[in-house]
């Protein structure tokens, strides 16, 4: 039986408030409520975003007498690493996190020669019900708070610095969940990821990618924020008949609406849109679908689009499989023939279920 779409999270308790949930005004108010001088707000933000410290007991520039109080009121331990697994000769690491209410989620840290990327979750589970995705099949548990999202980024940045003497360069909202279904918290997280310390982590907006299955009104809204992040549209089919099944949100917003919203995003931001297409053997890999994909994208976005073909990653209980390499090569050739840039994504983490569509937060 097909999963139902879920745009609203089930009602459940909220995570405790954390420094990372607050903007500058909120931090000032929280510090004032503790009876501390205003400069402590900036000091705490610098420790968290600049020095990547999440435990006030390690903040030696704070008076010892207030560290415990600050720890209890502004730095709850939101996420605990329940399990870590690695592959790709240690270059890919998947972390299973457990939140304070027992909810689990996953993030993936990937090291490349020229960049370091963390793939983060915006929801525990996902309500978009895509049948080829392990996360979507599990349903939506709840939205993550802004701080829970940012803690995944801070932990990755701290691990890179402490273990490898390196810096985090890229953040992709391609883990568990539909980012634009948790719009306000994801937006706040993006702002803090891109603002320079002490207001944020100082990662270039051009190095932040927000993916979506095609929530057209939210794509337009994100464009109007003018943040300059990369938009990744998970399309997976060029025709509504197939996409209605592969990406059920297509029953709400058709391909034409998603592409019109993507065009608006490209027009407003000047940024090229990335289109994600999981290539599934004998499902969406036919030559005519490659031709149609190229034509529709060229018509809608011109040069402001790039197609990432993703060989389907296996998920438990699924009979679907990745397309053979010759089919993949022909698909790329046909999309390019329509004047659209197209490459096959380097898939990392498949053997530890850390690749696209495999995150399910099981075990731990």
Swiss-Prot record:
<dbReference type="GO" id="GO:0051539">
    <property type="term" value="F:4 iron, 4 sulfur cluster binding"/>
</dbReference>
<feature type="binding site">
    <location>
        <position position="313"/>
    </location>
    <ligand>
        <name>S-adenosyl-L-methionine</name>
    </ligand>
</feature>
<keyword id="KW-0819">tRNA processing</keyword>
<feature type="binding site">
    <location>
        <begin position="177"/>
        <end position="178"/>
    </location>
    <ligand>
        <name>S-adenosyl-L-methionine</name>
    </ligand>
</feature>
<keyword id="KW-0479">Metal-binding</keyword>
<feature type="binding site">
    <location>
        <position position="211"/>
    </location>
    <ligand>
        <name>S-adenosyl-L-methionine</name>
    </ligand>
</feature>
<dbReference type="InterPro" id="IPR040072">
    <property type="entry name" value="Methyltransferase_A"/>
</dbReference>
<feature type="binding site">
    <location>
        <position position="130"/>
    </location>
    <ligand>
        <name>[4Fe-4S] cluster</name>
    </ligand>
</feature>
<feature type="domain" description="Radical SAM core">
    <location>
        <begin position="112"/>
        <end position="350"/>
    </location>
</feature>
<dbReference type="InterPro" id="IPR007197">
    <property type="entry name" value="rSAM"/>
</dbReference>
<feature type="disulfide bond" description="(transient)">
    <location>
        <begin position="119"/>
        <end position="356"/>
    </location>
</feature>
<feature type="active site" description="Proton acceptor">
    <location>
        <position position="106"/>
    </location>
</feature>
<dbReference type="GO" id="GO:0002935">
    <property type="term" value="F:tRNA (adenine(37)-C2)-methyltransferase activity"/>
</dbReference>
<feature type="binding site">
    <location>
        <begin position="234"/>
        <end position="236"/>
    </location>
    <ligand>
        <name>S-adenosyl-L-methionine</name>
    </ligand>
</feature>
<dbReference type="InterPro" id="IPR004383">
    <property type="entry name" value="rRNA_lsu_MTrfase_RlmN/Cfr"/>
</dbReference>
<dbReference type="GO" id="GO:0046872">
    <property type="term" value="F:metal ion binding"/>
</dbReference>
<dbReference type="InterPro" id="IPR027492">
    <property type="entry name" value="RNA_MTrfase_RlmN"/>
</dbReference>
<dbReference type="GO" id="GO:0070475">
    <property type="term" value="P:rRNA base methylation"/>
</dbReference>
<dbReference type="GO" id="GO:0070040">
    <property type="term" value="F:rRNA (adenine(2503)-C2-)-methyltransferase activity"/>
</dbReference>
<dbReference type="GO" id="GO:0019843">
    <property type="term" value="F:rRNA binding"/>
</dbReference>
<feature type="active site" description="S-methylcysteine intermediate">
    <location>
        <position position="356"/>
    </location>
</feature>
<dbReference type="GO" id="GO:0000049">
    <property type="term" value="F:tRNA binding"/>
</dbReference>
<keyword id="KW-0004">4Fe-4S</keyword>
<feature type="binding site">
    <location>
        <position position="126"/>
    </location>
    <ligand>
        <name>[4Fe-4S] cluster</name>
    </ligand>
</feature>
<keyword id="KW-1015">Disulfide bond</keyword>
<keyword id="KW-0963">Cytoplasm</keyword>
<comment type="similarity">
    <text>Belongs to the radical SAM superfamily. RlmN family.</text>
</comment>
<dbReference type="InterPro" id="IPR013785">
    <property type="entry name" value="Aldolase_TIM"/>
</dbReference>
<dbReference type="GO" id="GO:0030488">
    <property type="term" value="P:tRNA methylation"/>
</dbReference>
<keyword id="KW-0411">Iron-sulfur</keyword>
<keyword id="KW-0489">Methyltransferase</keyword>
<feature type="binding site">
    <location>
        <position position="133"/>
    </location>
    <ligand>
        <name>[4Fe-4S] cluster</name>
    </ligand>
</feature>
<keyword id="KW-0808">Transferase</keyword>
<dbReference type="InterPro" id="IPR006638">
    <property type="entry name" value="Elp3/MiaA/NifB-like_rSAM"/>
</dbReference>
<dbReference type="Pfam" id="PF04055">
    <property type="entry name" value="Radical_SAM"/>
</dbReference>
<comment type="function">
    <text>Specifically methylates position 2 of adenine 2503 in 23S rRNA and position 2 of adenine 37 in tRNAs.</text>
</comment>
<keyword id="KW-0408">Iron</keyword>
<protein>
    <recommendedName>
        <fullName>Probable dual-specificity RNA methyltransferase RlmN</fullName>
        <ecNumber>2.1.1.192</ecNumber>
    </recommendedName>
</protein>
<keyword id="KW-0698">rRNA processing</keyword>
<dbReference type="GO" id="GO:0005737">
    <property type="term" value="C:cytoplasm"/>
</dbReference>
<keyword id="KW-0949">S-adenosyl-L-methionine</keyword>
């Amino acid at each position: 039986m097909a999963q139902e779409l879920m745009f609203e999270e089930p009602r459940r308790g909220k995570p405790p408030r954390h420094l990372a949930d607050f903007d500058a005004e909120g931090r000032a108010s929280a510090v004032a409520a503790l009876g501390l001088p205003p400069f402590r707000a900036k000091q705490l933000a610098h420790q968290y975003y600049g020095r990547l410290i999440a435990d006030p007991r390690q903040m030696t520039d704070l008076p010892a007498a207030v560290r415990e109080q600050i720890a209890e009121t502004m730095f709850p331990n939101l996420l605990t690493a329940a399990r870590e697994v690695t592959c790709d000769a240690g270059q890919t690491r998947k972390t299973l996190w457990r939140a304070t209410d027992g909810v689990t989620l996953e993030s993936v840290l990937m090291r490349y020669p020229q960049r370091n990327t963390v793939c983060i979750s915006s929801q525990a589970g996902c309500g978009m019900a895509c049948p080829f995705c392990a996360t979507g099949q599990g349903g939506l548990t709840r939205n993550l708070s802004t701080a829970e999202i940012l803690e995944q980024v801070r932990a990755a940045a701290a691990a890179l610095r402490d273990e490898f003497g390196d810096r985090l360069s890229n953040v992709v909202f391609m883990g568990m969940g539909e980012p634009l279904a948790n719009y306000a918290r994801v937006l706040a997280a993006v702002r803090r990821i891109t603002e320079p310390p002490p207001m944020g982590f100082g990662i270039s907006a051009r190095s932040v990618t927000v993916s979506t299955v095609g929530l057209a009104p939210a794509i337009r809204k994100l464009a109007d924020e003018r943040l300059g992040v990369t938009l990744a549209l998970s399309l997976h089919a060029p025709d509504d008949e197939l996409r209605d099944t592969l990406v059920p949100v297509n029953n709400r917003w058709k391909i034409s609406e998603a592409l019109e919203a993507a065009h608006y995003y490209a027009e407003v931001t000047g940024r090229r849109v990335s289109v994600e297409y999981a290539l599934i053997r004998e499902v969406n890999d036919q030559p005519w679908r490659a031709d149609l994909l190229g034509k529709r994208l060229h018509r809608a976005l011109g040069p402001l689009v790039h197609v990432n073909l993703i060989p389907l990653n296996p998920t438990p209980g699924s009979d679907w499989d990745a397309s053979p390499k010759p089919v993949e090569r022909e698909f790329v050739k046909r999309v390019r023939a329509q004047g659209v840039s197209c490459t096959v994504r380097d898939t990392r983490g498949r053997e530890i279920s850390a690749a696209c569509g495999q995150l399910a937060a099981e075990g731990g």
